[in-house]
Design a protein with these regions (language model features):
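Motif-centric detector for short Cys/His coordination patterns
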Residues: 1-125
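Active-site environment of non-heme Fe oxygenases that use a 2-His-1-carboxylate facial triad
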Residues: 88-90, 94-141, 146-377
Length: 377
C-alpha cells in the first residue's frame, strides 16, 4: 500500500486516490509535543534543522492515521488521515481558508442593490455580522443604517469587529461643513467635487477598510459616489493589456503630510499578488506626486494613467447615492474608490466621522464567526 521512494512516499488516500507526500514536508509538519507546542500549536521544530537525508525507517497506514519512524533519531510522527486529506498538495489541494474572498465585480447596476444592514442587528446577531463582513469582503461596499448619532460611535463600531487602524489622521477624523464657516485643509474639506479615489495610498500598507459615519448630512448636493476598482482593472486588462502591465509595474509616488507626520510611498497603482492576481488598487490623483520615471517610460505611463482615469469617470462604472444622517458607509479601501459630488455649504450642515480598520481583521472575524458556527477551532 505504501511506496517509499528517495524523497517521498506514495499512499492511497480516499477519495483522492494515490497521492504523495515529501519526507521533508512530513517531518516539518509533525504535530507531536516535541515538534509543536501542545497549547499554542505553534511549531517548535526548526525547519532548517531537518537533515537533507531525512527518510522513514518504518511507515504504516492505520485505520485513522499514517505513522512514520524517521531516520533522524528514530523520531516517531503520526498524521491523521483526515489531516493529510485536508493538506494533500499533490492532487489539486482544496481551498481551506473559509475567509478567502469571493470577489463579485460590479458597475452601475449596484446602485439599486447596495448591501444594507441595520446597526443594532449587527450588534445582536452574529449571522448578520457574518453576512456584513462577507459583503465587505466580496463586494467592497456596504451601508450600515440607523447608527446612533453620537460622536465617536464609528470607533466603537469598529471595535465590535476588530481594532481601529491608526493613521496620520489618528483613530478618528472629523470632516465638517457648517454654513458661514470655511476651513479647507484638503480637497475633502472643500465643497468641490471629490473625484473617486482610495484613501491613504501614501502608505505602503494602506488601511483596508474605511468607515464614514454621517452624523449630519443636511446640505444640498454631496451625494456619495463609488467605483469598483477591480472591475475597472479587469476591463482595462481585456481592453489594453499593455496599459494594465504599465500600471502594474510603474511606481507612483504618493505623499500626505501634516503637523502629525509626513507619510510617503512609491508603489504601482495596480499591485499584484504572487499568482499575478490584483489585490490592491491605489488611486488618488490629488495625492500623487510628480512622476519620477525614465524619459522612455513617461509617455506610455501617462497614456495608461489617463486611460485608467477616464474609465474611472465612465458612468457605467460609477454609482451615486445619498447617505442619510445615521448611515455608515463602509468600503474595501484596497479595491473600491469613493468620492462625492459638490455641495452647497450654505444650505445645511455636514459632519462625518471617519475611521479605519485593516482588511485582514475583517477576514479574521469571518474565520472566527465561521468557527463558532461549526464548533471548530
Amino acid at each position: 500500500m505504501l511506496n517509499l521512494s528517495e524523497q517521498w512516499l506514495e499512499m492511497p488516500l480516499a477519495p483522492h486516490g494515490t497521492t504523495r507526500f515529501h519526507y521533508v514536508w512530513l517531518r516539518d509538519n509533525c504535530h507531536c509535543s516535541e515538534c509543536r507546542h501542545p497549547d499554542t500549536k505553534e511549531r517548535i521544530l526548526a525547519t532548517a534543522s531537518i537533515p537533507t537525508t531525512i527518510a522513514p525507517t518504518q511507515a504504516e497506514i492505520g485505520e485513522t492515521a499514517l505513522t512514520v519512524v524517521w531516520n533522524d533519531q528514530q523520531h516517531v510522527s503520526e498524521y491523521p488521515l483526515q489531516w493529510l486529506l485536508a493538506h494533500d498538495y499533490a492532487t489539486a489541494p482544496p481551498e481551506t481558508d473559509v475567509a478567502k474572498p469571493k470577489v463579485k465585480l460590479w458597475g452601475r447596476e449596484l446602485q439599486a442593490e447596495i448591501p444594507r444592514f441595520d446597526y443594532q442587528t449587527l450588534h445582536s446577531d452574529e449571522s448578520a455580522m457574518l453576512a456584513w463582513c462577507e459583503a465587505v469582503r466580496d463586494i467592497g461596499l456596504t451601508v450600515v443604517e440607523n447608527a446612533p448619532l453620537v460622536e465617536g460611535e464609528i470607533e466603537r463600531f469598529a471595535e465590535t469587529v476588530a481594532v481601529v487602524r491608526e493613521t496620520i489622521y489618528d483613530r478618528l477624523h472629523n470632516v465638517r461643513a457648517t454654513p458661514g464657516e470655511y476651513n479647507a485643509y484638503n480637497v475633502a474639506s472643500t465643497t468641490l467635487e471629490l473625484k473617486p479615489h482610495t484613501d491613504m495610498p501614501n502608505y505602503n500598507n494602506p488601511p483596508g477598510v474605511q468607515m464614514f459615519h454621517f452624523l449630519v448630512n443636511e446640505s444640498e448636493g454631496g451625494e456619495s459616489t463609488a467605483v469598483d476598482g477591480f472591475k475597472v482593472a479587469a476591463d482595462l486588462l481585456a481592453r489594453d493589456p499593455q496599459a494594465y502591465q504599465t500600471l502594474a509595474t510603474t511606481p507612483v509616488e504618493f505623499r500626505m503630510f501634516s503637523s502629525r507626520g509626513d507619510i510617503q510611498s512609491s508603489n504601482p497603482l495596480l499591485t499584484l499578488d504572487h499568482s499575478g492576481e490584483l489585490n490592491v488598487f491605489r488611486f488618488s490623483n490629488q495625492l500623487a506626486q510628480p512622476a519620477r520615471i525614465s524619459a522612455e517610460q513617461m509617455s506610455e505611463f501617462y497614456r495608461a494613467y489617463q486611460l485608467l482615469g477616464q474609465m474611472i469617470e465612465d458612468p457605467s462604472y460609477k454609482i451615486e447615492f445619498r447617505m442619510k444622517t445615521g448611515d455608515i458607509m463602509v468600503t474595501n479601501n484596497l479595491r473600491v474608490l469613493h468620492g462625492r459630488n459638490s455641495y452647497d455649504a450654505n444650505s445645511g450642515a455636514r459632519h462625518l466621522q471617519l475611521s479605519y480598520m485593516d482588511f485582514d481583521d475583517v477576514l479574521s472575524r469571518i474565520r472566527m464567526l465561521k468557527q463558532a458556527q461549526s464548533g471548530a477551532s
